[in-house]
């Protein structure tokens, strides 16, 4: 069974920087662990030990979010540059990409992140010694899956206007995926549910990243004075919109597959 602690095990306490992959793994670890803690709360009510750990995990996620967003936006722009054939658009995206390179965790915060990670890892080892029974887990997951499918059908059935609602649904999808991984002896159907939830969460996450990129572009556009540069920004928004529609189409197909398994 995959556990949240695996995401923290490879972090080198002697390092003085965090690369993109390490940030990604730590963020996955915080999401996985919060999903566990949420299920514990449903089964056992609020316990001081789990609530303290939950607070620490949320704090770590917040500390990592700025660098994580910068890394993701850098990667998105890099991918768009590789696919673009407009030289002026490529030049603008390259300039924007350079502005993201400075968004790294300062040494003082990095030290705090490493200390917080060690503390979370130690407390998580204790927590994993008292996993809930699968017979208690499965009814909760079955009900939650049905609710999320129903919510998703309503959200994806028409044009998206509330992106925060879509992002919240994305977080719930990822949470449910990690909670399904708590089942030790997964059936073929449960493995398929995990696979679809994972793919759906990934597609929804890409849509949210594109919204973050749009917000970043809007901030940078405010600093522009040339009318032609504003036209280039409009081209960028159009590209992002096209990518987003592709991801939404994939999400709708994945949801249909998921609804057949609920």
Question: What do these predicted ranges mean?
Answer:
Residues 1-262:
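Function-determining surface determinants
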């Amino acid at each position: 069974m995959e556990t949240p602690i695996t995401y923290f095990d490879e972090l080198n306490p002697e390092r003085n920087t965090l690369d993109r992959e390490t940030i990604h793994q730590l963020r996955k670890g915080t999401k996985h662990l919060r999903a566990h803690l949420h299920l514990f709360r449903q089964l056992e009510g609020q316990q001081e030990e789990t609530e303290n750990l939950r607070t620490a995990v949320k704090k770590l996620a917040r500390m990592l979010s700025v660098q994580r967003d910068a890394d993701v936006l850098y990667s998105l722009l890099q991918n768009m540059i590789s696919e673009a054939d407009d030289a002026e658009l490529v030049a603008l995206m390259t300039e924007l990409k350079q502005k993201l390179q400075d968004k790294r965790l300062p040494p003082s915060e990095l030290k705090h992140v490493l200390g917080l990670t060690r503390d979370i890892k130690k407390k998580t080892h204790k927590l994993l010694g008292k996993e809930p029974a699968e017979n208690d887990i499965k009814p909760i997951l079955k009900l939650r899956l049905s609710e999320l499918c129903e919510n998703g059908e309503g959200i994806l059935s028409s044009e998206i206007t509330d992106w925060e609602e879509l992002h919240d649904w994305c977080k719930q999808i990822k949470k449910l995926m990690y909670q399904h991984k708590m089942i030790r002896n997964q059936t073929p159907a449960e493995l398929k549910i995990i696979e679809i939830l994972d793919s759906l969460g990934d597609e929804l996450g890409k849509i949210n990243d594109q919204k973050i990129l749009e917000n970043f572009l809007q901030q940078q556009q405010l600093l522009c004075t040339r009318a032609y540069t504003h036209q280039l920004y409009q081209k960028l928004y159009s590209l992002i919109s096209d990518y987003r529609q592709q991801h939404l189409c994939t999400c709708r197909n994945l949801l249909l597959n998921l609804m057949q398994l609920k």
